[in-house]
């Protein structure tokens, strides 16, 4: 069986899927609180920037992959309007349930679907916009997932990938201390789960850097790929177009 990484561990590919599922079953209930604590609320600004770059218009069809608690889906549903179609999806049932309930509480009615990004259950050339926020790094076969995202885009459709990336070098030491000391402490203190937040820090370090992800998106068939560094590269937004 092929090996892959789960944080810094080398594991069988099948085991990774189960381990990642376990992480997100564990963190789902406290996901929004922990995002605010870990990022000092900055995740909201990163998502707002992504929403602005997506430029969803009335009537658009949008696929939100790894949609989690629904921040992007909520905004896109309002922008696409009654004539549009926004799918809130996640591979993790616990995250999808929390997101669906949160959207309903906000009065946002949009379809929710359990979805594996490596096997997207939609036809070719269907969506105007596909987004994945803080989900790509957890996928076992990122190249397969990116190719699938491109497949379901319409010609001239755009893929937006918001993900942790490589921080500016002068901040690396401070960022490492924060990631490997503070994040697990926050996880234990507020969610009684240090291990999942240790995985978060490790998975960020194993994720491709800005230029590598840009190349991967190009190899998946996307054109005009560019990226925006946010918060000194803690996060990057990559945008590519299908032609």
From Swiss-Prot:
EC number: 2.1.1.163, 2.1.1.201
Catalytic activity, reaction form: a 2-demethylmenaquinol + S-adenosyl-L-methionine = a menaquinol + S-adenosyl-L-homocysteine + H(+); a 2-methoxy-6-(all-trans-polyprenyl)benzene-1,4-diol + S-adenosyl-L-methionine = a 5-methoxy-2-methyl-3-(all-trans-polyprenyl)benzene-1,4-diol + S-adenosyl-L-homocysteine + H(+)
InterPro entries registered for this protein in UniProt: SAM-dependent_MTases_sf, UbiE/COQ5_MeTrFase, UbiE/COQ5_MeTrFase_CS
Residue positions binding S-adenosyl-L-methionine: 69, 90, 116-117
Keywords: Menaquinone biosynthesis, Methyltransferase, S-adenosyl-L-methionine, Transferase, Ubiquinone biosynthesis
Coiled-coil ranges per UniProt: none
Transmembrane regions listed in the UniProt entry: none
Assigned protein family: Belongs to the class I-like SAM-binding methyltransferase superfamily. MenG/UbiE family.
Function, in words: Methyltransferase required for the conversion of demethylmenaquinol (DMKH2) to menaquinol (MKH2) and the conversion of 2-polyprenyl-6-methoxy-1,4-benzoquinol (DDMQH2) to 2-polyprenyl-3-methyl-6-methoxy-1,4-benzoquinol (DMQH2).
Matching HAMAP family: MenG_UbiE_methyltr (MF_01813)
The protein, known as: Ubiquinone/menaquinone biosynthesis C-methyltransferase UbiE
Organism: Paraburkholderia phytofirmans (strain DSM 17436 / LMG 22146 / PsJN) (Burkholderia phytofirmans)
Lineage: Bacteria, Pseudomonadati, Pseudomonadota, Betaproteobacteria, Burkholderiales
């Amino acid at each position: 069986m092929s090996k892959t990484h789960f944080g810094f561990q080398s594991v069988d590919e099948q085991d990774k899927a189960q381990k990642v599922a376990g992480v997100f079953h564990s963190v789902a209930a406290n996901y929004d609180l922990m995002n605010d604590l870990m990022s000092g609320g900055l995740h909201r600004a990163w998502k707002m920037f992504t929403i602005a770059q997506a430029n969803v218009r009335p009537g658009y069809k949008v696929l939100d992959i790894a949609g989690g608690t629904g921040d992007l889906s909520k905004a896109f549903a309002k922008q696409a309007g009654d004539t549009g179609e926004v799918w809130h999806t996640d591979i993790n049932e616990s995250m999808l349930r929390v997101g669906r309930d949160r959207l309903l509480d906000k009065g946002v009615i949009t379809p929710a679907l359990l979805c594996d990004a490596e096997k997207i259950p939609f036809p070719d050339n269907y969506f105007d916009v596909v987004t994945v926020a803080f989900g790509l790094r957890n996928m076992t076969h990122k190249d397969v997932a990116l190719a699938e995202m491109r497949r379901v885009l319409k010609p001239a459709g755009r893929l937006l990938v918001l993900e942790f990336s490589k921080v500016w070098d002068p901040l690396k030491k401070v960022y490492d201390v924060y990631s490997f000391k503070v994040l697990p402490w926050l996880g234990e203190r507020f969610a009684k789960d240090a291990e999942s937040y240790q995985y978060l820090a490790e998975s960020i370090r194993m994720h491709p850097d800005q230029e590598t992800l840009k190349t991967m998106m190009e190899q998946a068939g996307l054109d005009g790929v560019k990226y925006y560094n946010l918060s000194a590269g803690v996060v990057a937004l990559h945008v590519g177009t299908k032609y």
